[in-house]
């Protein structure tokens, strides 16, 4: 689907909202519902022209229908297109994602295309992008060879130098990068899961993780530890020239 043909596009990445089944309940000493709403308010006050939100997983900490329904109701009230991929805490049976979890989905913004991958595996904390999706991804990169590509998934492909979270990274990064290495139109890979900001470059591709809208994890920690950084989000300004 093509959303518009303007020259510049603003995409907001949010991640790891960890919503509870009741909006007053806390997650790790924070009310994730209130924090999520405050982050969104901060975004819309400063960025009046948003083309889409992309949520990179762990919408829910308690993954039941009413949790997801509150998320949907709130996001729909913003009157801005929004998309999401599942995280390890999400439940595909109740998830407000596309029904076919092993199908790769693509959203077009003029010369840019955002590709949504599902790295969540039922019953696992670790991530894995299955062969069916990798094959579809390769077909998409071939079909849209003239497009600038952004890929979004939940699990981080590369280590964060944080032992406890790195054991739960994307486990088949080599399979993913083997596909990406064949094409020169992939510009950005977005992920969540790690509750912190990070950046690295690989073969000219920018890999970003984004802060959670709830609690943050302490960087470079061998053991689970929280950080005092505030909740956050990522802004992508996509230009016609591919920058």
PLM features: residue spans?
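N-terminal active-site segment of His-dependent metallophosphoesterases
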Residues: 1-70, 160
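Beta-strand-turn-beta hairpins that frame and shape the catalytic cleft
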Residues: 3-13, 106-116, 141-148, 201-207, ...
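Binuclear metal-dependent phosphoesterase catalytic core
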Residues: 5, 179, 201-243
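Acidic/histidine-rich helix-loop elements
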Residues: 12-35, 60-61, 91-101, 123-131, ...
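Active-site neighborhood of phospho(di)ester-bond hydrolases with catalytic His/Asp-centered motifs
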Residues: 13-15, 52-58, 82-88, 118, ...
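Metal-dependent catalytic neighborhoods of phosphoester/phosphodiester hydrolases
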Residues: 23-25, 55-76, 91-103, 127, ...
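His/acidic metal-ligating clusters that form di-metal
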Residues: 38-52, 127-206
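Short, electropositive alpha-helical surface patch
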Residues: 65-81, 168-177, 204-213
């Amino acid at each position: 689907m093509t959303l518009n043909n303007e020259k510049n596009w603003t995409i907001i990445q949010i991640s790891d909202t960890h919503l509870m089944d009741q909006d007053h309940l806390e997650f790790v000493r924070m009310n994730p519902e209130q924090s999520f709403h405050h982050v969104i308010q901060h975004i819309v006050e400063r960025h009046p022209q948003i083309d889409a939100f992309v949520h990179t997983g762990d919408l829910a900490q308690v993954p039941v229908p009413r949790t997801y329904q509150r998320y949907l109701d709130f996001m729909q009230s913003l009157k801005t297109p929004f998309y999401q991929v599942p995280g390890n805490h999400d439940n595909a049976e109740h998830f407000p994602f596309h029904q076919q979890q092993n199908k790769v989905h693509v959203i077009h913004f003029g010369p840019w295309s955002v590709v949504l991958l599902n790295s969540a595996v039922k019953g696992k904390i670790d991530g894995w992008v299955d062969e069916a999706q990798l094959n579809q991804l390769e077909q998409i990169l071939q079909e849209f060879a003239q497009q600038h590509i952004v890929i979004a998934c939940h699990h981080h492909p590369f280590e964060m130098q944080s032992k406890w979270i790195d054991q739960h990274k994307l486990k088949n990064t080599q399979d993913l990068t083997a596909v990406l290495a064949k094409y020169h139109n992939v510009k950005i890979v977005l992920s969540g899961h790690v509750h912190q900001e990070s950046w690295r470059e690989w073969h000219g591709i920018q890999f970003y993780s984004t802060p959670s809208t709830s609690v943050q994890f302490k960087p470079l920690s061998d053991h689970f530890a929280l950080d005092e950084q505030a909740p956050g989000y990522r802004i992508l300004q996509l230009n016609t020239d591919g920058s």
